[in-house]
Amino acid sequence: MSNARKTLKILALIYFVLGIASLVIAGVGIVKGSLDSTYGPNAMLAAAVLAIKGLVDLAAGVAGIKGANKPSQVDGAFKLGIVAAIATIAQAVLTLPAFGGDAINFGAFVIVVYDLFFIQQAHDIKAENKDRL
């Protein structure tokens, strides 16, 4: 197994765990109404965005594990990595009012860099797979 495949598998496992955590946080936030204190009137929007981002992360994690194990199927991980990066940017923009509207969401920036690294590893595996065929 190449280094790119090993790295993609680790990144995909992290995605999988983060996806489950996002879904749990969104679910608990909706049920308990605890997101109101953080996001105020945008609480339901934040919960919906968090749930959608969790589903995308979960799907990217599954596709990444699948692609790391079987390189011919890594295209799904590549595409879901792009969707995850877009979803992270959307989450940062939609939850910006919670930070006063003028703050920089450094957490979202770090996650976008992580998303791009995931995409790059999936692309490397696609290139390796092309070379082998």
Region spans (language model):
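Cationic, hydrophobic amphipathic alpha-helical membrane-interacting segments
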Residues: A21-G27, K66-S72, V93
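Loop-to-transmembrane helix junctions at the membrane interface
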Residues: V56-T88
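Juxtamembrane "helix-exit" motif on the non-cytosolic side of transmembrane helices
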Residues: G27-L35, V93-G100
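A loop-to-helix transmembrane entry motif
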Residues: Y39-V56
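Membrane-helix boundary connector in multi-pass membrane proteins
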Residues: A87-G107
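Alpha-helical transmembrane segments of multi-pass membrane proteins
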Residues: I14-S22, L50-K53, L80-Q91
